[in-house]
Amino acid sequence: YEAGGSSAKSNLSPKGNKAKLQGDWLQYVTCINDYIEDYNPIIGRQEELLRTIQILSRKEKNNPLHVGEPGVGKTALVYGLASLIERHEVPECLEGCKIFSLDLGSLIAGTQYRGDFEKRLKAVLDGALAASPAILYIDEIHNIIGAGKIDKGSLDAGNILKPYLEGGKLRFMGATT
């Protein structure tokens, strides 16, 4: 499994992954499960973590969104969840899930033509769907709802995400301030 990822994570070393994933979409995501050994355990957020697991375990409306001030630990909850998944301490419906963190910087960078952003995002969504069971984590999700929108008739990320949200094809987690 060769993952792209943000430069902030370049000094971290991914652990060996059982399944080799392939595709151009990997340059826009980082598999959090591969990096959990490099992070400290989550402490004092069990209630929020349990609630996140409950939401992800639902059959419908199963996409949690963490809202809070900067630095309160919204992303830490995602790493805590990945740690629980790797230790097999989650419900059966979440067993074996890979959590992919979307790198918005690389996804948006260089999208100078109308439709480039949508094409890249759709490739990421299709890739994550093919890697199922998977959860796509979008930090600062407010930045992409409306991104790429030029006029009333054009697509934006919200319209691209909707088909994947319907029917639980792919699970999402979001965070915003």
Per-segment meaning from a language model:
Residues 116-121, 146-167:
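Substrate-gripping "pore-loop 1 plus following alpha2 helix"
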Residues 1-108, 117-131, 135-143, 167, ...:
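Histone-fold recognition with a strong bias for associated Lys/Arg-rich disordered tails
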